[in-house]
Design a protein with these regions (language model features):
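Short hydrophobic alpha-helical segments used for membrane anchoring or interfacial signaling
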Residues: 8-16, 23, 113-121, 126-128, ...
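Sensory modules in modular signal-transduction proteins
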Residues: 1-7, 107-112, 119, 213-218
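Regulatory loop-to-helix N-cap segments in sensory/regulatory domains
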Residues: 34, 41, 101-109, 139, ...
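A short, aliphatic-rich beta-strand micro-motif
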Residues: 81-89, 188-195, 291-299
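Short hydrophobic/aromatic beta-strand element in the GNAT-like acyltransferase core
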Residues: 7, 49, 72, 85, ...
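Short loop/turn motifs at secondary-structure junctions and domain boundaries
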Residues: 2, 40-43, 66, 74-80, ...
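Regulatory sensory and allosteric helical modules in signal-transduction proteins
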Residues: 13-67, 122-130, 134-172, 228-235, ...
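Flexible loop/coil segments at beta-strand boundaries within sensory signal-transduction domains
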Residues: 89-94, 106, 195-200, 227, ...
């Protein structure tokens, strides 16, 4: 079973902060696309990474044939259809941009959504843009839906200012569009809030379909009160629903494995292989048959995607 996210990339500013350069990534078998990416640079507001740098919030390209996307032909050759860029910011300074490039094969598509609240103009979250694949009616419904603070997956992530994982979107108390989601096979969701210095809020939602899950596992780790270690907060895995029991007493220190390195550096980390990763997270993932992981850090939490 293929995941909806096919390629993950990490871009970081050059020393003079005039461009973004390639840092690391997960490409599976797409070595030619990796080689092309390693040669590229993105200026401020250029391409998908540069747009996220310029805006300071997530950006969706619902079509990679968009003239703003700089690797159109290469993306088409490996079946990529859409992408999202997630800025990693600390103290108003860009540390990295994580780019997720997706392909659904037009079967059982998942969805990517970007929601926005501007308190000077409206009280709820409104859809900025989204990718829905063949789910036309679900897209239409979403474009005419708003979420007050605390309501639905986007609204609850906004209220808590924490990522929210929902492993059963059939629960109408959590996911207000559950009937439409059921019709297209979407059954899991992840919401990630992004607070902007302007006071505006963006929420990125990943809706996972049974046939093409966004990723095989999501994990959220948060700092302890003394901020000396990270502890497990929430997660979901389609390979082992009981995986969290192994984390009950687990603590991750800075530089301990991929998550600890992301926390220490403030930059996302990628692991194309878990063979030499000794952390409790990597061992749990490997035991579930997962082979790669991406860690992204934000101020008060890290979140992990596994394939």
């Amino acid at each position: 079973m293929k995941t909806f996210i096919r390629i993950a990339e990490i871009w970081v500013p050059t020393e003079d902060r005039t461009e973004l350069r390639y840092h690391d990534g997960l490409y599976g078998t797409h070595d030619e696309f990796r080689a092309l990416s390693q040669q590229m640079r993105f200026k401020y507001n250029e391409g998908l990474p540069g747009k996220a740098w310029a805006t300071g919030h997530p950006v969706i390209f619902r079509e990679l044939e968009d003239s703003n996307f700089k690797r159109t032909e290469a993306a088409k050759a490996v079946g990529l259809t859409c992408g999202v860029a997630l800025p990693v910011v600390a103290d108003d300074v860009l540390k990295a941009v994580v780019v997720l490039l997706c392909g659904d094969g037009n079967v059982g598509a998942g969805a990517l959504e970007l929601w926005h609240n501007d308190p000077s103009k409206f009280f709820e979250l409104r859809l900025v843009d989204g990718y829905y694949g063949p789910a036309v009616m679900f897209e239409l419904n979403s474009r005419h839906t708003g979420f007050p603070r605390g309501y639905g997956l986007p609204g609850r992530a906004w209220k808590s200012n924490m990522p929210l994982i929902v492993n059963d979107l059939n629960d109408s108390r959590v996911f207000l569009r559950w009937k439409e989601a059921l019709d297209i096979g979407v059954n899991r969701g992840l919401g990630i809030p992004y607070l902007h210095p302007s006071g505006r809020t963006w929420v990125m939602t990943f809706l996972s379909a049974r046939n093409t899950p966004i990723a095989r596992r999501f994990e959220i780790w948060v700092p302890t009160q003394d901020r000396e270690t990270l502890i497990f907060h929430a997660g979901d895995c389609d390979q082992n629903s009981e995986f969290a029991t192994a984390y009950k007493s687990a603590k991750i220190e800075k530089n301990d494995g991929a998550i600890g390195q992301a926390w220490a550096s403030g930059i996302a980390t990628a692991r194309a292989s878990l063979a030499h990763e000794k952390s409790v997270v990597a061992q749990s993932a490997a035991a579930a048959g997962l082979s790669a992981m991406l860690e992204q850090i934000q101020v008060d939490f890290t979140h992990s995607l596994h394939a």
